[in-house]
Amino acid sequence: MSDSKFLAETTGDWQSMDDFLRHLADRPASSFLLPHASPQETAAILSAHYAEYQKELFFAADAACTNELSLFGQTFAYSDEIDWQSDPVTKWHWPILYRESLNAFVGSTRPVDLIFFWELNRHQHFISLGIAYWLTGEQRYVSAFIRQVKNWIKTNPVQHGMNWYYPLEISIRIIAWTMAFQFFRGSPEFQQEAGGEFMKSLWQQIDFLSCHLQSVRSKDDVPNNHMIAELTGLILAGIAFPEFNTAHKWRDVGLNLLVEQVTAQTHLDGVNKEQATGYHRFVSELLLLVVMQSRRGSLKPQPILEATLEKMLNYILFSTAPTGTNQMWGDSDYGRALGLGQKKDFWDFRPLLSAGTVLFNRPDWKFVSGRFDEEAFWILGHEGMDHWKRIASRIPEQTSCAFPQGGHFVIRDSWSADSDTAFLRSGKFGLGGEGHCAHAHSDLLSFSLWLQGQPLLVDSGTYIYHGPLRDYFRSSCAHNTVMVDGHNQAAPNPNFNWRHVLNARCLNWSADHVSGIFNYRGVEFIRTLRRTGSGNWTLDDRFAGEGTHEIDWFFNFAPGLDFDLRENDRILFVTRAGSPFLKLHLPDGDFDFELQLGWYSNQYGLKQRTQKLYAQWRGRLLEDGTLFHWSFEADQIKSVSQRGEYAAAV
């Protein structure tokens, strides 16, 4: 793309690319996306309040200068140039073909997983390099950025190669490039050596994205988080670069479609319809970026987006476990909108509550989030920090909460850090229904349980989107639910989507119990989970149907526990760190019980062995239902107290 052709796509009368770049460099910082104008002021706040984060930021930026990158907690080092076309894990090289010729490589028979490859090419480490340069003025950060971005542009010709295949990935990269540009734009070295190439490539990616949104790619597609991410990238690009002729279209069309999609993809109670909590986080982060621009006056007021975001964050509030982490329902590729807190546990969603505290003046969110997180600081700036300090923390009025449209139910005895808390799912299988539900798992009427603030029963997670263990992690046996006659609750398609989808619904709920129901091939299953006292819970499973059936139960335990199964006594003893933790009383009847090895993954691409209790019953169901009773009894009964912080450990 020539300079003249590029400048023809702008609204000004710039005579050269140098003039255009100087114009962007001279624009006030307030006209870009992050509300930070003074590196000295920001550096002082980081040193005073976020010293450990600041250390990690510079460590990551220094490593990136030597082509060493951290992806999902794993380090990948490149001795020469970064290989943008190869999977970092297997080194499998994607061909540089026209994007539509790559369809054959991307289906269910593709040779490797794509997530590490895409994470590498999202370029969120460019933001760290930019911040490090902006704070220090050290040229090595600029030099590394120039070297890497020029190499990427050279090795990724327009519409060729896997980095032009998925518009979602292009959108996240656009956001990262736009944020990084805010910090590099004043560098003479950047302007002279890479500025023109950078801006041309950025425009080409935005232009491509505007013509390849998810909703127009296929009539069979069900728009999901991809569409929301794509629209967010368009909107933010339109805000950051009003100099482009079509910037107003990117912004306005993107905004109209975003309101439409957010409304369509979110239940009225704030639960994301994909039934995948990791994508609930991802979408919340994207909406936060857009709502923040509205609050800053870069967009007109967005009451629908604000109301939806507040409800989504309220779901996060109640889905936060005593350990400070959220639930791992459904799939997750561990993607983040900005990646400003990569070192933190992905499942700690409290940074979102931290920002939401300020945006929506929520003292209860401040209580649970505990601190004004560094991610919130970057997005909301110094004024956001001042606002946070003025809000008085308050314990949430409710302990338990139901999200009936989303089908999520929370039972909690207190907001203390040693609370007993249960989370149960009883609702729609996923987004799109039959043949879709791409990121849902076979987990209806599954539940997770924390006793005395510690995890007991957990969701197994996702692990990976490719390979033989993909189906294990999304199957019923990886969740704390049941299988009828040896079948998953739905039939998985390769890698994504489900057939023969069923749904569950809630029968009744109160602050200390919940009952849900689904029907699988003529067998009605009703599960009732009840808190009967401090450290004590009961689980009643009732099955009704005709004929003889086989019922399988799965209880997937958290890592770090030990077990003693005494089948004759119908008790499973659970210990933690050598101390008694729980007695699980098993049902009477003709059962087979067995402790089996399971898997647990709370980071993409990493897994560890855990144990699970497997139980099987075979017999003829009674006409009015056959009841199986389980009870959980904590060995050390706590004294419930309202502590000053919820899940104080960060």
Feature names for model-found ranges:
Residues 2-108, 115-119:
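Extended, charge-enriched "interface" segments that sit outside catalytic cores
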Residues 7, 31-40, 444-466, 470-491:
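Acidic-aromatic substrate-binding/catalytic surfaces of carbohydrate-active enzymes
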Residues 37-38, 63, 75-77, 85-89, ...:
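Structured loops at beta-to-helix junctions and adjacent beta-edge loops in soluble globular domains
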Residues 83-87, 91, 397-400, 407, ...:
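Beta-sandwich/jelly-roll carbohydrate-recognition scaffolds of carbohydrate-active enzymes
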Residues 94-107, 111-310, 314-325:
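Aromatic-lined, polymer-binding surfaces characteristic
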Residues 115, 120-122, 406-408, 444-446, ...:
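Extracellular structured ligand-interaction cores
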Residues 171, 337-345, 358-372, 377-378, ...:
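CBM-like, beta-strand-rich accessory domains located in the C-terminal region of large
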Residues 271, 275-457, 508-513:
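Carbohydrate-active enzyme catalytic cores, enriched for enzymes
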